Swiss-Prot record:
The name this protein goes by in its record: tRNA-2-methylthio-N(6)-dimethylallyladenosine synthase
Location within or outside the cell: Cytoplasm
NCBIfam families: miaB-methiolase (TIGR01574), MiaB/RimO family radical SAM methylthiotransferase (TIGR00089)
Gene this protein is translated from: miaB
MTTase N-terminal domain boundaries: 19-135
Domain annotation TRAM: ranges: 396-464
């Protein structure tokens, strides 16, 4: 950990009163969960949540570095706050997350107005790090460390659906991905600690949990214990069985899965356990085996297809979503077309797409056969059009069906509608008949008849 005392005291004025904070989160669900924990820590310290970023006494950016545009957005935000700090020296500026881990001390040099740079493994150490800042130091905390179990202070954004981290880090070495170098090695939490957190959520009237991990189906590989059959004792499958009996929790989800570890046993558990939702997010990244090999993904398209077939053989209406990268270095037009074909053949419910973006400290960034920006834009546009078409077709299967929707709140764009999600994770807007007096609470499950299907959402009417 780097601690640098600020010599120019005009740059630092210790604020004798605890003020307000603002957190902006970039990137994945793991970052969202980390932001909730940091918000809880700040409120425990006495900070209150600001209504306006430009009025906050402490501004924290929880950052992402998976693509270059995410980084540039952070630097844009920092530039605005740096100017503000020159006018208000007591303002505390914090950068957390993957960009902080990647850049470390160099980020303090690039943006000298920063007080604290901290990697993802230091989320639970925020209070101690801010204590060093209060002593007049600039701090960079990016060394790899064991992640503590302190999750008690999380300030949840939802009062119904809760994130639960079960494994941190990633041991894979995909040639395009910076995550292992910024998130560190895999660290699985022990089952009892996970169940205890879920029980607390249930006690607080949460109805749905989402288990999180960069590679969630690799959960337990680093934990001790082996069964008589020779497999690891604590796997994601075992964990699902273990937590299933927590009373009050109605729905269980998990993300993100890696095809390499997605087993028949896991599929069978999802089929047998009625709280586990029929939604599977399994990135395929490319529809071409040669590109998958260059990506170092560790599976073939045939294996990926078998996973989907095994899921649908038990759960025909399961929702399958995925991630895909286009214009990977050296990707030919024919290889790109294989990705389009896979999307059409499988009929994904949704695919999150991105054009390849070179990342620091990754093998693919050094290759000389990079694809032009023009081709990247063309391929991304075409694949997005296909995804929109297939997503709408998949959603049209719901027309005239009755779906159970967990209420999450009102539609912010239409106060006459409430909104929630189906078990298959379809965002659903619900019309309430004007002549009906309908009392509901967040977390209620209601039956909805679907009468409209759009590419990424459904609309229906309350079933009476």
């Amino acid at each position: 950990m780097l601690t640098k005392t600020i010599k120019d005291q005009n740059k630092f004025q210790k604020d004798s009163t605890i003020g307000s904070y603002w957190i902006t989160t970039f990137g994945c669900q793991m970052n969202k969960a980390d932001s909730e924990r940091m918000a809880g820590t700040l409120e425990k310290m006495g900070y209150t949540r600001a209504d306006d970023e430009l009025k906050a006494d402490l501004v924290l950016y929880n950052t992402c570095t998976i693509r270059d545009n995410a980084e540039q957005k952070v630097y844009s935000f920092l530039g605005r706050q740096a100017k503000r700090k020159h006018k208000i020296p007591s303002l505390k500026l914090v950068v957390a997350g993957c960009l902080a881990q990647q850049e470390g001390e160099s980020l303090l040099r690039r943006v000298p107005e920063l007080d604290l740079v901290m990697g993802p493994q230091h989320v639970n150490n925020l209070e101690n790090l801010l204590g060093k800042v209060d002593l007049g130091n600039q701090v960079a905390a990016t060394e790899e460390t064991f992640i503590s179990e302190d999750i008690t202070n999380a300030r949840r954004e939802s009062s119904i659906c809760g994130w639960v981290n079960i494994i941190y880090g990633c041991n894979e070495r995909c040639s395009y991905c910076v995550v292992p170098s910024v998130r560190g090695k895999e660290q699985s939490r022990y089952p009892d600690a996970i169940k205890s957190e879920i029980q607390k959520l249930a006690n607080d009237n949460f109805k749905e949990i989402t288990l999180l991990g960069q590679n969630i189906d690799a959960y337990g590989r680093d934990l001790p214990g082996t069964t008589k059959e020779g497999r690891k004792e604590n796997t994601l499958t075992d964990l699902l069985y273990y937590i299933h009996d927590v009373e009050g929790i109605r729905r269980i989800r998990f993300a993100t899965s890696h095809p390499r570890y997605f087993s028949r046993r896991l599929i069978q558990a999802c089929y047998e356990l009625d709280k586990v939702c029929e939604h599977f997010h399994i990135p395929f990244q490319s529809g071409n085996n040669e590109i998958l090999k260059l990506m170092a993904r560790g599976y073939t398209i045939d294996k990926y297809k078998r996973i989907i077939e095994n899921i649908r053989s038990l759960m025909p209406n399961a929702s399958i979503t995925a991630d895909a990268i286009v214009a990977f270095p050296g990707e030919s037009e024919e290889q790109y077309r294989d990705t389009l074909k896979l999307i059409s053949d499988i009929g994904f419910d949704q695919v999150m797409t991105a054009a390849y973006s070179p990342r620091p400290n990754t093998p693919a960034a050094l290759w000389h056969n990079q694809i032009s920006e023009e081709v990247k834009k063309e391929r991304l546009k075409e694949i997005n059009e296909l995804v929109e078409t297939t997503s709408k077709q998949r959603n049209e299967r719901y027309l005239d069906s009755i779906e159970s929707v967990l209420i999450e709140g009102f539609n912010p764009k239409n106060s006459s509608q409430i909104m929630g999600r189906t078990r298959t994770n379809r965002l659903t807007f619900v019309e309430i008949p004007k002549n009906i007096k309908f009392n509901f609470s967040l977390g209620d499950e209601i039956d909805v008849k679907i009468n409209e299907a759009r590419p990424f959402s459904l609309t229906g009417i309350l079933c009476l």
